[in-house]
UniProtKB/Swiss-Prot annotation:
ATP binds at residue 249. Monomer. The gene is gltX2. This is Glutamate--tRNA ligase 2. PANTHER family: GLUTAMATE--TRNA LIGASE (PTHR43311), GLUTAMATE--TRNA LIGASE, MITOCHONDRIAL-RELATED (PTHR43311:SF2).
Length: 452
């Protein structure tokens, strides 16, 4: 069974980049009838906050990306300890004693010589006595995973195609800090094995991590004496950039809370992000099944995916315009019925704007100043107004015949007097909602304005 996971760290709110990753993992699983799991990567006890765990769950629920299961790394520490000891027994992890300052100095020296900043494995050259001396001085070791330099790392990436890394050009990653806490690499691999993850879909900034983790998977399988297992399939999607094509701090701060405050529908955000970075056009598709049916990793491109806020707003507007009254009635101001919704709907960019447009019906409105000629015209309109199945059509037809007005001269003063605006909902739908008595009063009020 296809099983994917979304593994955020609860050190902040989800932003648009990892929302997209969560969505694509959900889509990959659901397209194939599989499972989408949530893993909370909370091994960093100092930075992880419970409030962010709740926020992550709430954001996924708002987006309709309900996980089929959840794990928390903070509750699985014994599994990482067991894996660590197994790798240690197999000679695949080793202690290192350099301080952060010493490592940074080595890095600067390598860069100054035009060399890649790869860890030099100095710790492997220490004798038992030298290690004992460091620990006697109170220097606790951190631990690195020892890459096998004799075996090239290869995999078929579902987005990037064939990948090949020379492990000698990679640093042995630190997997455990001197205080005993875990870094990302080992817990992630252990969890992927235990959770039965079949596909890892993540950003291209993880490509080198994948190269390391493939060897880690192999080492863990060997330690478990399970040579039949193989690592998950990997897919690395292009990073999200602003519409100018640059990485943007703003994208890193754009989260579900910001989108909700702006009135963006979850369906719009899903429709936008589902196809962003693929060869398929972004369209206002609210039907998840349509998006799932067309989801295909082979359409994912290598170029950075450009997130355009204006495009999201266009998608949102189109989706709002297609929403049924039943979908939104609980979110509308009191008094708006199906007829009211359909009257104002074409003018909405967000559902939240419904209240503003509904005030054209409930009032009060602010009328502009009219010329003497228009005031006389509106006085005639107040007398002419007759209530039938189509009061707007009847009124404008009679006024056209009696005054000879047409076009803007016929319609605009009426709209301004009845709504206080130069544009807005279809008056044929709006006028019956205003009602005969109120409509006549507004026309008469405009006609009774004192001349300037």
């Amino acid at each position: 069974m296809t099983t994917t996971r979304f593994a955020p760290s609860p050190t902040g709110r989800l932003h648009v980049g990892n929302i997209r990753t969560a969505l694509h993992n959900w889509m990959l699983a659901k397209k194939h009838g599989g499972r989408f799991l949530l893993r909370i990567d909370d091994t960093d006890a100092e930075r992880s906050k419970e409030e962010y765990v709740h926020a992550i769950r709430a954001d996924l629920a708002w987006l309709g990306l309900e996980p089929d299961g959840e794990e928390r790394q903070s509750e699985r520490l014994e599994h990482y300890e067991a894996a660590f000891e197994a790798l240690k027994a197999a000679g695949r992890v080793y202690p290192a004693y350099e301080t952060a300052q010493e490592l940074e100095l080595k890095r600067k020296i390598q860069l100054g010589r035009g060399l890649p900043p790869i860890y030099d494995r100095a710790a492997l050259k220490l004798s038992d006595d030298e290690r004992a001396a460091k620990e006697a001085q109170g220097i606790a070791p951190h631990w690195r995973f020892k890459l096998d330099h004799d075996v090239p790392i290869t995999w078929e990436d579902r987005v990037r195609g064939p990948q090949k890394f020379d492990p000698a050009q990679l640093s042995d990653p630190v997997i455990r800090r001197a205080d005993g806490s875990w870094l990302y690499m080992l817990p992630s691999a252990v969890d992927d094995i235990d959770m039965g993850i079949t596909h890892v879909l993540r950003g291209e900034d993880h490509v080198s991590n994948t190269a390391v983790q493939i060897q880690m998977f192999t080492a863990l399988f060997a330690a478990q004496h399970d040579a039949q297992q193989s690592p998950p399939e990997f897919a690395h999607e292009a990073l999200l950039v602003g519409k100018e094509g640059k990485l943007s701090k703003r994208l890193g701060s754009l989260g579900c809370d910001a989108f909700r405050e702006r009135g963006i529908e979850p369906e719009a955000l899903v429709a936008m992000l589902a196809r962003l970075g693929t060869s398929q056009p972004v369209e206002p598709i609210a039907d998840r099944q349509v998006l799932l049916d067309t989801f295909d990793l082979s359409t994912f491109g290598r170029a950075p995916a450009k997130f355009d806020d204006a495009e999201l707003e266009r998608v949102n507007t189109a989706i709002v315009h297609a929403m049924d009254f039943e979908q939104v009635k609980q979110r509308l101001p009191e008094g708006i019925d199906a007829a009211g919704w359909h009257a104002i709907q074409p003018n909405l960019a967000t559902v939240d704007e419904a209240g503003e447009w509904w005030r054209l019906v409930t009032g009060p409105i602010e009328q502009p100043e009219f010329s003497d000629e228009d005031r006389a015209y509106l006085a005639e309109a107040a007398e002419t107004l007759a209530w039938d199945d189509d009061p707007w059509g009847t009124l404008t037809a009679k006024l056209k015949d009696s005054t000879g007005r047409k076009g803007k001269a016929l319609f605009l003063p009426l709209r301004q007097a009845l709504t206080g605006m130069n544009h807005g909902p279809d008056m044929g739908e709006l006028l019956p909602l205003i009602g005969e008595e109120e409509a006549r009063a507004r026309l008469q009020s405009a006609a009774d304005q004192r001349g300037g």
